[in-house]
Every structure is written in C-alpha cells, then in structure tokens.
C-alpha cells in the first residue's frame, strides 16, 4: 500500500466510525425522547397507544381522588381540555389542586386515561411554555397558587 492509499483507508475508516456513532446516538435519543403536550394539543396530536409523552398543565380543582395504596387519580387541564391521569406512587410535596404539574407516561390502548409513571409538581409558570402560561393568565388563573381555576 502506498502512503496515499493508507491515508485514504484511515480517513474512510474514521468517516465510517463517525457515521456509525452518530446513527447510534440518534437511535438512542429517538427512543428516550418524550414530547411535551398540554391537554388542548392532544386532540390534534396523532399519538399511538403506548407512546411516551409529558403531559403538562394545572391539576383541576376537585379532581384529586386517592385510591387503594399509593394510587391517585386526578385531571390535568389547560382550560381548553381536561385529561384524566392515574398515578401510582408518592406525589411531590408541591402537588395540589390548581398547581402546575408535568406527568410523564402514556395512554393505555382503548382508554382516554393517561397512566403516569412520573409526576413533577411546579409552583409557577417558570417551566411552562409561554403560550400556555399566557392563555392561563388571560383566563384569570394565577400561577403562584393564589387563585385556582374557576
């Protein structure tokens, strides 16, 4: 092999290695990504049952029901739509009606109930998409816990 052929072989091997690494990273990210939706956007979204998503909004007033053991059912709303959620586990200390929440999980096939395996409670609109926070403020919902949904 000449020097030129060796150089081309090394460059070709490096490009092949980098291509394989990029493809593996892209595949891993596509499996781990959970897109964020608010209840009003779910009607437009074409989600297959079992697709993992993050559902964000406010815990609807009067919707929290404690079941057997650690099972809790509640509804998440963005004032346009309401989604029933079931969660089994210990809820965060900041979780309460009228407060912001992000639940990660999936819809069960043949059901409109969102089954969450992770629930994060928020105390204000800091991590809420701007359009959702603006819509809630326009409806008179204060996101610091001072006022609840009417």
From Swiss-Prot:
Keywords carried by this UniProt record: Cell inner membrane, Cell membrane, Cytochrome c-type biogenesis, Heme, Iron, Membrane, Metal-binding, Signal-anchor, Transmembrane, Transmembrane helix
Membrane topology label: Single-pass type II membrane protein
GO annotations of cellular component type: plasma membrane
A molecular function (GO) term: metal ion binding
Annotated binding of heme, by residue: 123, 127
Segments in the Periplasmic topological domain: 29-150
Keyword Chaperone recorded: no
Primary subcellular site in the record, as a coarse category: membrane
Gene3D superfamilies: Nucleic acid-binding proteins (2.40.50.140)
GO BP: cytochrome complex assembly
Disulfide pattern: none
InterPro entries recorded: CcmE, CcmE-like_sf, NA-bd_OB-fold
Pfam family membership, one: CcmE
Keyword flag Cell membrane: yes
Protein's cellular compartments: Cell inner membrane
Entry's transmembrane regions: 8-28
Role description: Heme chaperone required for the biogenesis of c-type cytochromes. Transiently binds heme delivered by CcmC and transfers the heme to apo-cytochromes in a process facilitated by CcmF and CcmH.
Family indicated by similarity: Belongs to the CcmE/CycJ family.
Protein name according to UniProt: Cytochrome c-type biogenesis protein CcmE
Species of provenance: Sinorhizobium fredii (strain NBRC 101917 / NGR234)
Lineage of origin: Bacteria, Pseudomonadati, Pseudomonadota, Alphaproteobacteria, Hyphomicrobiales
